[in-house]
Regions:
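Catalytic cores of nucleic-acid ligases and guanylyltransferases
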Residues: 1-158
Length: 158
């Protein structure tokens, strides 16, 4: 954020993202410049609310997927590095500078019950998850011993 052109970086370098999504991130950010760690989710599906039809039958609407940016960490804000600050504090800073919107989401932080979240994360288009120690620092380009990366979310066995 703070660059004149979309500036999404992936593991392999620059990632092309839609200008509208970049503009949405900029519009929802309350600072001049920021380095936000997150993921472009290509097939995001909003959770459906339970509705009732005229005959009293309950149903949920099925919506098509869309691309969103899901933010999960803030690494720098207005030129100040947050890399040495614990994750929980970086999260508080992230919530202070980035407002969630339909196309920009803050990923949930949970302390337990990952099994319950697995189905929700899969339904929303996430394919991997990173479990992090609340007090972990951020090391650019590396997974630390304080993190556990689950590369593929699988459906629960019956």
């Amino acid at each position: 954020m703070g660059h004149p052109e979309p500036h999404f970086l992936g593991y392999g370098g620059v990632v092309t993202g839609p200008r509208e999504l970049y503009d949405a991130i900029v519009a929802e950010t309350q600072c001049n410049t920021a380095i936000i760690d997150g993921v472009l989710v290509n097939d995001w599906k909003d959770e459906s609310e339970l509705e009732v039809d005229d005959q009293g039958n309950a149903y949920t609407r099925q919506f098509g997927g869309r691309q969103i940016f899901a933010a999960f960490d803030l690494l720098e804000v207005d030129g100040e590095s947050l890399l040495e600050i614990p994750l929980l504090e970086r999260r508080r800073h992230l919530e202070g500078v980035l407002a969630p919107s339909p196309n920009v989401r803050l990923t949930p932080y949970v302390t337990r019950g990952l099994r319950a979240w697995r189905d929700t994360l899969q339904a929303q288009g996430f394919r991997r998850v990173v479990l992090k120690n609340w007090n972990s620092a951020y090391t650019p380009g590396k997974t630390t011993d304080d993190w556990l990366v689950i590369e593929k979310l699988k459906a629960a066995a019956p």
